[in-house]
């Protein structure tokens, strides 16, 4: 007999290396836009949740294996991923951004030809750059923060990642103050959804209903202002 969704504590997993979306406080407590959003969903949907910080590499395998119930990790909704998992309606829309030393600009991804570009293993930025096939050398990291450290040290020429992450490192990180700027934003939007295993229909319906409410009553925009400084 299946246990009702509301009767058990659901494990939510995310890779807490993407401020302001998902990251750890100095006391190692998960925080960020996605974290606040999933807690708001849980409150409205009468769900008990606990959050687990996991590495991005292998995060989908862990969901498939049943190690956790929901992914809340800035997970881009793609046709390939939808073949294996179910996604909620989007809770955030983003574009890929290229960060370079402050003052540098490029007109397209093609301008990265011959440059070394850092990113995190398996994220959309890597896929976008690979598909563009512009002749850039891609250097992948376990943590996007390491890519920005190498950018600051001159070991890579640029970093590509989701625009809220790019803006955080370019504008809000005091240790990188004045060092970085957004050199280019790719014009193909992507949408983040919470991700569950196939067949979890009751859970998916609860999540979607709560997301729709959060959008309708302005709570989503309040979270955007809190974490990104703007609701745009």
What are these regions (language model features)?
Residues 35-44, 110, 115, 121-123, ...:
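Extended ligand-binding regions for polar small-molecule ligands
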Residues 16, 92-100, 163, 167-212, ...:
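Periplasmic-binding protein-like
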Residues 7-75, 83:
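Extracytoplasmic small-molecule ligand-binding "clamshell" domains
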Residues 48, 124-141, 177-182, 209-232:
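Ligand-binding clefts/hinges and TM-proximal coupling segments of bilobed small-molecule sensing domains
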């Amino acid at each position: 007999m299946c246990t009702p969704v509301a009767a058990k504590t659901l494990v939510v997993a995310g890779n807490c290396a993407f401020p302001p979306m998902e990251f750890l406080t100095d006391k190692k407590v998960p925080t960020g836009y996605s974290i606040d959003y999933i807690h708001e969903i849980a409150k409205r949907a009468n769900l008990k949740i606990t959050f687990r910080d996991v590495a991005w590499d292998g995060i989908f395998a862990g969901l498939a294996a049943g190690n956790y119930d929901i992914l809340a990790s800035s997970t881009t909704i793609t046709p390939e991923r939808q073949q294996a998992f179910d996604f909620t309606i989007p809770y955030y829309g983003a574009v890929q951004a290229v960060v370079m030393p402050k003052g540098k600009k490029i007109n397209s991804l093609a301008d990265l030809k011959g440059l070394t570009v850092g990113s995190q293993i398996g994220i959309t930025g890597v896929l976008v750059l690979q598909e563009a096939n512009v002749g850039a050398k891609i250097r992948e990291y376990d943590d996007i923060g390491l890519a920005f450290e190498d950018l600051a040290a001159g070991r890579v020429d640029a970093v590509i990642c989701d625009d809220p992450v790019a803006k955080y490192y370019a504008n809000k990180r005091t240790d990188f103050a004045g060092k970085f700027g957004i050199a280019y934003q790719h014009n193909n939007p992507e949408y983040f959804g919470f991700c569950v295993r196939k067949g979890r229909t009751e859970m998916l319906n609860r999540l979607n209903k709560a997301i729709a409410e959060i959008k309708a009553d302005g709570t989503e925009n309040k979270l955007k202002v809190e974490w990104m400084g703007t609701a745009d």
